[in-house]
């Protein structure tokens, strides 16, 4: 990268309580051409004691939030607090004119999220929600195929994002604080892709269930209705080897697309080639009619593409491909499915 082409973004991280916080920091520090990481803050003693010695934060100063705000020429903040503090923290940052990369979901207070979006628009701040499936190369192939009309008019989408936390009692207890339980935490990844393809649904109907007699909704289904299509979103944290069977299926009048798994597992996570099974009624692009296995390449760095885009958006080198209006509609749809008033 040429020095005269992009200004390095001076960035700090507020919060280490989000489960993606350490990986996010590792990525920021691995992109020194784009980011100058100047510090980190965590006001919750529980999360500070649990995670401040992680290697991701080695050598970085732990500061108070006010000390971070006082850093000269600070451009942006990555907000990685525990989920219940994301919006309140983001609002304080936005009010100070800082560009925001915020982990997800965006809180159960929809009016707070709406206020955040409004401030970002008024102050011309970059706002990036950390939904990483939108950068998944196989799902990007699917979205491009849909956009280019390869599979005709969509009439059905089936999506699943599950995992097995049957023995992870601490995580199950943490999930139970949210009205939608596990569905609240994971369904937004899938809804994001659906809304990018089909837009806002006409109606959202959800079925939120428990596999155990405890406080956690650990098995959820939402049906998004459109004039000529339905899309289902399933989330469970009780599916044995559920990560292996995360999937996205799109059916159209002239073909279909199927991705399973959405992400590779374990040691192959970053390196295994993701494959889409595509069936076409007519020849499209370089593909003949019929069924194809399309190699879409490996995931690579989970957050690299997204954070590089964040820097480019701040520097006005690109327009945010996921505008505030989309983020607002996505969060509204998620909260509706979780039974949260919006």
Give the residues covered by each predicted segment.
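N-terminal Rossmann-like dinucleotide-binding module
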Residues: 2-56, 311
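Beta-loop-alpha module in the N-terminal Rossmann-like domain of NAD(P)-dependent dehydrogenases
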Residues: 57-119
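Rossmann-fold dehydrogenase core element
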Residues: 115-133, 153-156
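Predominantly a Rossmann-like dinucleotide-binding segment in NAD(P)-dependent oxidoreductases
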Residues: 133-213
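Contiguous beta-strand/loop segments that form the cofactor/metal-binding neighborhood of enzyme cores
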Residues: 191-266, 304-318
